[in-house]
């Protein structure tokens, strides 16, 4: 029943560049319908609101998700899920107007780090990390959930870094020696502020690596 979101690239399990299992990564609330999804649920790309139809636009099946604890005292650290996909159906690079492919490495969020993302709604945007180790409250259909150890991005030029439908976008470093290294997974926003899950715990939770350059 989820209508719109962003696939935040491709990840794999296995060793080297030839992973044994490939998955698309996004948010729980995008791929798993805010805890209501069932393993094996079909994933469409594009989503229903963008004209996606069964069976022609099916690209995979829900494989796993981290449940979001609906509580204002919870210690959620991610809103994340993965869907099993056939490698030929989903690439790991952004569209031509994006930043290309992420680097198959990660960095931890630090203050004032320049970042960018490519998402379904606002496409390519840039910003800076303006808060780390943040605690944020996010509304879900079942109630409000608290997230801890998050980071916050402010869009450049007083413009929003994200909009509705950008959830699931991979946030990467913008420029410098760490250009295109993954920093986090976008999951919520309000006005010019966007909340992001650090990428490290997500990769560890699902035992996956980023597919990229």
Question: PLM ranges: what are they?
Answer:
Residues 1-155, 162-164, 172-178, 183, ...:
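Serine endopeptidase catalytic core focused on the charge-relay Asp
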Residues 163-213:
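Short hairpin/turn module used for nucleic-acid contact or packing/dimerization
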């Amino acid at each position: 029943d989820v209508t719109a979101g962003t696939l935040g690239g491709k990840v794999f399990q296995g060793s080297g560049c030839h992973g044994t299992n490939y998955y698309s990564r996004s948010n729980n609330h995008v791929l798993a319908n805010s805890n209501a999804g069932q393993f094996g649920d079909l994933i469409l790309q594009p989503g229903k609101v963008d004209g996606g139809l069964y069976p022609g636009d099916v690209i995979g099946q829900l494989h796993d998700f981290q449940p979001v604890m609906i509580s204002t005292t919870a210690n959620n650290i991610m809103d994340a899920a993965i869907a099993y996909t056939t490698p030929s159906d989903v690439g790991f690079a952004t569209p031509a107007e994006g930043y290309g492919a992420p680097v198959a490495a990660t960095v931890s969020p630090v203050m004032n780090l320049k970042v960018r993302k490519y998402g379904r709604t606002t496409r390519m945007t840039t910003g800076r990390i303006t808060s780390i180790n943040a605690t944020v409250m996010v509304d879900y259909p079942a109630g409000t959930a608290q997230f801890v150890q998050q980071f916050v991005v402010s869009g450049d030029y007083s413009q929003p870094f994200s909009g509705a439908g950008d959830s699931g976008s991979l946030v990467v470093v913008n420029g410098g020696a760490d250009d295109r290294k993954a920093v986090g997974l976008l999951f919520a926003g309000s006005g010019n502020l966007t909340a992001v899950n650090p990428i490290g715990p997500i990769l560890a939770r699902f035992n996956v690596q980023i597919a990229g350059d």
